[in-house]
Amino acid sequence: MPRGDRYELRWFTPRCEVKLCGHATLASAFVLMTILEPGRESIPFETRFSGPLTVRRDGALLAMDFPALAPWVCTAPPATLHEALGKDPAAVMQVEDNYFAVYEREEDVRGIRPDFRLVEKLHPAGVAITAPGVDSDFVSRYFAPSYGFPEDPVTGSTHCSLAPFWAEQLGMTSLHARQLSERGGELWCEVRGDRVILKGNAVLTLQGKLLI
C-alpha cells in the first residue's frame, strides 16, 4: 500500500502473519520497479515488525537491505528436534522462534528427511538446517509446517541469521548461498554490521487485470 514515497508491506502465509519474508519482498519490489513504476531504482518499504526495508537494483539482481539477526547457541534444544530431523546436528542455534541445526557437510543437509509432524509440534515456528557448501559458501533448507508449508523453496528471512553466522565462521562478509529445496535457489549475501544485504532475481510469470 503506498504511503507518500514509501510502501507499507506485510506478509501472510496460509495460516498466519509473519515478521519478515524475503521472496515476497523481492516480488513486491520487482512488480513496483518493472510494472507500476518502471525505471525506479529503489523502493523503500515500511513494515509492521521489521522496520524500514529498502530494495535497490544491483545490475541484473535486486538487493534487499534487511536487519541482521545473529543466532545464539541453544544450550538445551528439545529432544524432539533431533528426532524430527533424523540425524543429530553438530550444533543447534536459535533466533527468536526459529531453530538452526548446523551440520558438517552439504550432503547431510541434502539427505535430511524430516518428520513434519514432529517439526510442527516444536514450539518455535520453523527449523533451518545448514552446512558449509561444496560449490557455495553455505547451504540450507527451511521447514515450517506450523506456518502452512512443510518446506520453503527459498527463505530470505533465515539468511538474515545464516549470513552473520557463516560470515563469522568463515571469516567472510560476502557469501554465496544455496537453498537445497526441491526447487532450489541461490542468494548472494553481504553482512554490513547490523544489516544484511540479500541479492536475488525475480521473473515475471503471469500478468493480468482484476476488475473490482
What are these regions (language model features)?
Residues 1-20, 24-212:
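Active-site proximal loop and beta-alpha junction motif in alpha/beta enzyme cores
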